[in-house]
Amino acid sequence: MINNINRIKKTYNTFLNVNKLRYSTSIISSNILENDNNNIDDFEQVLKSTKVRMPTSALLLPKKPKVCIGMSGGVDSTITAKLLKLQGFDVTGVFIKSWDEVEDTGRCQGERDWKDALEASNFLDIPMYKADFVKDYWNRVFVDFLKDYKNGLTPNPDVWCNREIKFDLFFDFAKENFGVDYIATGHYSNLYYGEENVGDNNNNNLQLHRAIDKNKDQTFFLCMTKGERLKQAIFPIGGFTKENIVSFAKTIPNFSKITSKKSSRGICFIGKRPLPDFLSQYMTLKPGDFFDISTNSFIKGKKHKGSVCYTMGQKANIDSLSERYFIVRSDIERNIVYVCPESQFDQFSLYYEFNTHSFNWINEIPTEVKSEQGFKGRGICRHRGDVVNLTIKDTGKTSPIDGSVIYSVNLDQPLRSVASGQILCLFDRNTDRCFGGGVINSSPLYNPTQF
């Protein structure tokens, strides 16, 4: 048991020692836990000795910083709060409400999550509050979500929720109401603050890096958040694996409920509902035809529920066909959804290039971006997606959407079904550093010539 604990400490300390090299990173084995024989005292020892990275200006504070943590009632934010509490931080918990589930569905998972968060905060002996951002979420995230779908795009509202709510309004709320120095979340990601000038409000030394647990890494959801806002945050569990966090929680009897909760997947406010059922509450959906590009004909007797509901790459779910069919393209104007058999799908779905706009550079823009050769990095286009080598270059053109710079992106290996409206998360070629992200604008690989 002692050896097991020492291995956890050694792994995390190795991760921290890497930070002494200005911006280096290292991939560390996540095969740390092999049994569940450890007790709460053992794991508390690990949490107490795990140093939390903070800006160097925090060292000038007369005592440990005052931190407000967003608590969801899940295991990640709960263990994050416990870690901070054990290390003497002045911790306040806030449950962020951004969606009115009762009005939307008549059910309320959010209230159950609130009760779980409240129970956890009571056990941890930290004050707990609820912040209502429902109207703000509607105006700053959901309205654009609906508009994008109406225009045939594939938005990711969770990315924009982080940018607009969790790392913008939430920090302002916490600062105004509780006078906090920083906010904390249970994100699996890492921030490197570098050598900062005290009193300097720029973020020239801030860097966002992937978590050591690549399967749970959430940097993708943070890549569109502005650097000056990330500078106000700390991510205490980015150096742990999900397995570590769950094992910590299992040693605490009061936390047994949260360890059995499933991680949320998909768009948070849609839940398990089919997308057409959800969108039909907010826009008029018109049934239409499926067009089979392998036979160059419409599929008789089969109707879709509205072309705005279908995204390139998803299963078409058309029954009574000889093989599985996939969405190739949705024509919003004609209300036609183009599909093809799985056996032919690659020729209409593999992308080697696309453009991005509205790019969010967390820190400085690499000088190579404006060179003829471009900047050679890596990228992903969806959470847990394939990480591929790429070259990104400033085209010298601006987007008609918002006047932002258009960047061309060329991939060394193709990515499947890169839809407009999705997000490109840009990484360094050789490290886990995230430079930021941009909104994808891709051209369909299939252009119909007849109907």
UniProtKB/Swiss-Prot annotation:
Catalytic activity: 5-taurinomethyluridine(34) in tRNA + S-sulfanyl-L-cysteinyl-[protein] + AH2 + ATP = 5-taurinomethyl-2-thiouridine(34) in tRNA + L-cysteinyl-[protein] + A + AMP + diphosphate + H(+)
Alphabetized GO MF terms: ATP binding; tRNA binding; tRNA-5-taurinomethyluridine 2-sulfurtransferase
One Pfam family in the UniProt entry: tRNA_Me_trans_C
Chain positions covered by the region annotation Interaction with tRNA: 216-218, 386-387
Residues given in the record as ATP binding sites: G70, M71, S72, G73, G74, V75, D76, S77, G186
UniProt xrefs under PANTHER family: MITOCHONDRIAL TRNA-SPECIFIC 2-THIOURIDYLASE 1 (PTHR11933:SF5), TRNA 5-METHYLAMINOMETHYL-2-THIOURIDYLATE -METHYLTRANSFERASE (PTHR11933)
Function of the protein: Catalyzes the 2-thiolation of uridine at the wobble position (U34) of mitochondrial tRNA(Lys), tRNA(Glu) and tRNA(Gln). Required for the formation of 5-taurinomethyl-2-thiouridine (tm5s2U) of mitochondrial tRNA(Lys), tRNA(Glu), and tRNA(Gln) at the wobble position. ATP is required to activate the C2 atom of the wobble base.
Protein name as catalogued: Mitochondrial tRNA-specific 2-thiouridylase 1
Protein species of origin: Dictyostelium discoideum (Social amoeba)
